[in-house]
Regions:
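Accessible peptide chain termini
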Residues: 1, 168-170
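Active-site-adjacent C-terminal substructures of enzyme catalytic domains
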Residues: 1-95, 104-110
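Hydrophobic aliphatic residue packing
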Residues: 34-36, 128, 170
Length: 170
């Protein structure tokens, strides 16, 4: 019924597993043709980002669902499926002429690009652009592309963020 109504399902497996010891029947949702999105739930029980939530979904897919989802489908669930669900596919969500260049550039360590996205960790994020403008990334890249980005430090790595950029026009 959800697929027939054009609905989507937001799947937060980390939060589900921590709070309830189980998660939704995501394989059934896929079988029914539901648009599936993966994202963190909330701070106390969820992951800190979609990138981290993707790792839990991947573990569940491999160990419980017996690879019901391909790596490509899991990556779609943190990217294009979300854009499609909120009705923004005419503006962003794909690399296409005329769409906003919202991109994430990662270090490459896996031959398969979708597996690379799934296994990427915070230090692997080299650059994030929103509307073609750099907003987050490696310090050297952000210094070359922006004026005086704010430097932030993680455990064993540093990144830079442009906190002056305003992309919201009211």
């Amino acid at each position: 019924m959800l697929a027939e109504a054009g609905g989507s399902l937001a799947w937060s497996p980390t939060s589900n597993l921590l709070l309830y010891g189980q998660t939704t029947n995501i394989a059934s949702a896929k079988e029914e043709g539901v648009n599936i999105m993966i994202g963190p739930d909330w701070g106390p029980s969820g992951s800190k980002s979609s990138m981290h939530e993707l790792k839990t979904a991947d573990w569940w897919n491999r160990n419980v669902l017996e690879n019901t989802f391909t790596d490509f489908e899991l990556v779609q669930a943190i990217s294009t499926n979300i854009v499609d669900a909120i009705g923004w596919s005419d503006y962003t969500g794909r690399i296409k002429v005329g769409l906003a260049a919202d991109l994430v550039v990662l270090d490459t360590f896996e031959q398969d690009p979708y597996r690379n996205v799934i296994l990427a960790t915070d230090p692997d994020v080299r650059l994030v652009t929103v509307g073609g403008l750099p907003v987050y990334g490696d310090v050297d890249i952000m210094n070359a592309m922006t004026d005086e980005p704010e430097i932030i430090h993680g455990t064993g790595f540093s990144k830079a963020v442009d906190i002056t950029l305003s992309l919201i026009h009211i």
